[in-house]
């Protein structure tokens, strides 16, 4: 029986969301690395004492599925009696937490009130380097997680707010950029205890511990009820979707990802059991992030205003077969999981769209990445960037450019000024790739291009996935294009790579051109509004040849569209 009235529940829920936002703002402002303060590859959340999410407002929705497993990972090794007020725990092991790969480290802080653990605050953030063969710990040659850098089961990062000496020594000796790793972790831990725990304690002082913990349960039940109410309106049945991700071990092999959205009354089950067996290479993805993606898709289809909390997990089930790409067995590598997760997002949305009877959305582009680290005796750094590409088109609108897959839409491109001021590179080109967006009545988001001039010997890792299976169009729309990495383009020693690569040696003066993939289009290109075609042509989004051959514009119209307007005297 609820002891907190509905109005108080909603006030407490809003306060929890505010606390999460404030924690995230603190991490952003105090983080050391560009991956935190520029790319925004981090989040924060609040769980109850069992690890059920009660507050999360993340720019990266899959993190919703990660925090329960991270807290449970800590509880697997530490009892409540072994915790003290001000302790912070650190974990990154993909098979003992919700962390998708070792680069993502989570800080977990138990919140004490009246002498007992009442909740946990947690923050996940990508780390620039945690050791391993390649700078940035991005290694396509990894055949187990031990080749992907430092693996940490739960350990103390702070003991009663005092840095844990042994943990800090461990981190310093296993990173090319220890000051960034420890600095970012300090930002996360500081946000949790100085804002998260402090605000939660004040909330419980104000409303009472029992009322707040009761509200934790009630706001989850309300989310569950709302989701079930809408699912019950859908037609019972099985709705399937599939897509592909490229294997890293065999670049000519596609791995099939499959989902069945099963609607049964007010219950939705997403069954991924027909997905291909796991790869030997680091393209596999552990279940927690896929679950988070499922919850995010359900919210998007039902009501974007639904609070993110454990009620989603009670209304949406996920089923996996062990030993598949989406549920690999220990110690299978998972370092490039995000390249697979972009396809997972596409097929989940396709299946749920069918179940909900809503128009399909073209597949999103898979965002690329740039990781460059110095070698030899020069200034030591690891340059880590996310290259956010384009969204898929939908019936009624073009896909956005420069946002990447929707689940990473809260991440951002690092500015040219920051890159050139902090790393030994010069940006020679930053532009959109003409004719890249999947053609259609509604065009897919375009690919991005960046060219870097290297100013000291370095090693490169990154690229774009889905070379064999670019983002799919829908309803007659065309597919997007694949991405590529070209070393010294246009020169006699030009080298072009597709897919994901690592450990590519670069010399001073080399030029690296990175082009991301692009998103699919929706509808027949010949049905695209003529004014939209002309505007795309004038903006350089499409070429005159494409305007004529693909969109049906006459050569005269194309020429006229690009003719300079007469000056008005």
Regions found by a protein language model. Give the residues of each.
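Glycine/proline-enriched, intrinsically flexible loops and inter-domain linkers
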Residues: 1-85, 90-113, 117-569
